[in-house]
A protein has these predicted regions:
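Short beta-strand-to-coil "C-cap" segments at the C-terminal boundary of structured domains/repeats
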Residues: 145-151
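Compact beta-sheet-dominated globular domain cores
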Residues: 77-81
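Structural motif
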Residues: 1-17
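Edge beta-strands of jelly-roll/beta-sandwich modules across compartments, strongly enriched
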Residues: 137-145
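Surface-exposed ligand/attachment interfaces on beta-rich extracellular proteins
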Residues: 13-56, 64-75, 86-96, 103-138, ...
Length: 151
């Protein structure tokens, strides 16, 4: 089946759930900083992993970027995050651990990934900002995000 997210809820309590998301985006010389989404487009309420107001969330992610025409040039990072969200829906990355698994962009280019706890229409969401400081590379980014939200 073709899905980009999976939602799990416990039989024993209703204030927590776990979701698994596949995220995508592309960067190039003209658009060198982007945010990942479920459909590879700009983050909207319908295509971005949601958080919840007045909650804590635990996230684990692997984000991978590869030059579109040469699989030698890659960037890979793993993240463990704790995100807190106020009753008003303002999310904050309270704790993060980033492990760069591979950092091999071409020449003098710089590629990077950072977590982004954002609001869309006053609701909290989690995504990742990907960047490639480049004059010529097109980088395809993909991410695997596991997100547990407790309200």
């Amino acid at each position: 089946k073709n899905i980009s997210a999976m939602h799990m809820v416990s039989d024993h309590f209703t204030d927590a759930n776990k979701d698994i998301f596949i995220l995508k985006r592309q960067t190039d010389a003209s658009n060198n900083t982007q945010q990942l989404s479920l459909d590879g487009n700009s983050p909207l309420a319908t295509n971005t992993p949601p958080l919840a107001a007045d909650s804590v969330a635990f996230a684990s992610a692997t984000i991978f970027g590869q030059e579109a025409s040469n699989n030698t040039y890659v960037y890979a990072a793993k993240f463990d995050l704790v995100i807190t969200t106020t009753a008003g829906g303002i999310p904050t990355v309270a704790s993060d651990r980033k492990i760069i698994v591979r950092n091999n962009p071409p020449g003098q280019e710089t590629w990077n990934v950072v977590p982004a706890a954002i609001q869309i229409s006053a609701a909290p969401y989690l995504t990742f900002q990907v960047s490639s400081v480049t004059s010529s590379s097109t980088v395809k980014w993909i991410g695997n995000l596991e997100l547990t939200v407790v309200t």
